[in-house]
Amino acid sequence: MLDELDKKIIGILMKDSRISYREIAKELNVAVGTIYNRIKKLEESGVIQGFTLKLNYENIGYDLTAIMGIKAQGKKIREIERIIAKDKRVMCVYDVTGEYDIIVIAKFKNREDMNRFVKGVLSIDGVEKTNTHVVLEVVKEDFRLEP
């Protein structure tokens, strides 16, 4: 279970994962060794799974975001999810309830790129149908959830 200090450390790292232990310690008024030990413990327990950066995907050529619902044969769902998850354009693969069995969020350079992806998904054994939504405007896209 996370205590208040762990939550504060995580909150700071979520805003800037490059911040030094010394800066975190100063901000929270604790010893640098405490910060080091807490972060190490959070990594070892799997709470922190790595340090990354936040990209502006449009600035690197991925101008199109799509959300795809996939209806699949029950016994093939896991295999389909694994195949789709390997594609570098795929941001998220969710096993869900409702009309569709799988929801995929992916980024593409253009409509042709998306079209090839959709056709590729439709060719996977066990995929019955897809429903693809093109995102017109990203209002919020932030997968960071502070504890």
From Swiss-Prot:
Domain of life assignment: Archaea
Cited CDD domains: HTH_ARSR (cd00090)
Entry keywords, A to Z: DNA-binding, Transcription, Transcription regulation
GO biological process: response to amino acid
Keyword Transcription attributed: yes
Stored Pfam families: AsnC_trans_reg, HTH_24
Annotation: DNA-binding region: 21-40
Disulfide-bonded cysteines: none
SMART domains, per the entry: HTH_ASNC
Keyword hit for Transmembrane helix: no
Signal peptide range: none
SUPFAM superfamilies per the UniProt record, alphabetical: Dimeric alpha+beta barrel, Winged helix' DNA-binding domain
GO MF entry, a single one: sequence-specific DNA binding
All copies of domain HTH asnC-type, residue ranges: 2-63
Gene Ontology CC entries for this record: cytosol
Protein name: Uncharacterized HTH-type transcriptional regulator PYRAB04820
Organism: Pyrococcus abyssi (strain GE5 / Orsay)
